[in-house]
Amino acid sequence: MPQPDWQSIENLAYQIIVDAVHSIRRQHSHETIYAAIFHNFYCDNTHLYFPSLSVGTEELLARVVEKYQNEYGSAESRAELEQSLRWSGADLAEYLFDSGAAGNAAAQSVQAAVRPEADW
């Protein structure tokens, strides 16, 4: 059973983070970046996928909180919503990055090594 190239996967994850943060810095230079968050570890019963990455900025978080308050009439205070949404990469999807073909190939190598006989 082939083993994944863990160093290559780690390097890919690092490069995705660097590229995403640089992209947001270029496109939204006035915004304050506070995090790059991997999320959506996903398998569709056929394939395992590389996680998505969202970049969190204070300004994006403020927009997401406002959206939640306006659309859902949240009973939580603004501070409580900020706290609960700050680390939710899926809610910060406006600044979402995909790993592309390289990420999917890396995920497939992990899937093949972990359970080659699995019915995904």
What is the predicted role of each segment?
Residues 16-20, 24, 48, 53-55, ...:
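Non-transmembrane, interaction-prone segments in cytosolic or luminal domains
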Residues 1-37:
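Short N-terminal edge-element motif at the start of the domain
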Residues 27-68:
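N-terminal interaction modules that seed assembly of large macromolecular complexes
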Residues 2, 75-120:
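Low-complexity intrinsically disordered segments
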Residues 68-74:
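The catalytic "switch" region of P-loop NTPases
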Residues 5, 29-34, 46-51, 81-93:
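Generic structural motif recognizing short loop/turn segments at the entrances and edges of beta-strands
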Residues 21-26, 41, 75, 80:
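Short, flexible coil/linker segments at or flanking structured domains
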